Amino acid sequence: NTSGLLMIPKNNKTHEYLANLIKNHDLIKKYHAILVGNYPRDNDVISDPIGRNNLNPKKMAVRPDGRPSVTKLKVIERFGNEATYVELNLITGRTHQIRVHTSYKKHPVYNDTMYGAGQGKVKTEEQVLQSYYLKFAKPFSQEIIELEIEPDEKLSKVLTYFRNRRV
């Protein structure tokens, strides 16, 4: 249910190329999210291993026997103790990585019903997490492609709510 930019390969050759970009950390993927609470550090690197949740096979969890997983976090804006607007940079790309890492740090993604506390004061249909930036070398030509989008409706709605409360 994450919104924003998405890469879909059209053929096997491009799929293989994309898989290698990810494996070699040559694909830069950044996300914007609203986290519950006041995240304690302005910059953080979360490097807890992630694996399948033993109690619920549809969920992932931080586990000592999990796969290495690294998420860089940078605070953009704080809203007191209620919420924190952050940029997240995936170094690895595990299933639900951002949601698992932030929940494990006791600051789940806002309105995340799977890993967080459910709906907050501002209702949205899904968690407030948006893929907003991609940078990679185009297959075959190696031309650098850089894509960036503005905050979507759900992110804007929650940001507006918290910004208006400060006034």
What is the meaning of each model-derived region?
Residues 1-167:
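RNA pseudouridine synthases
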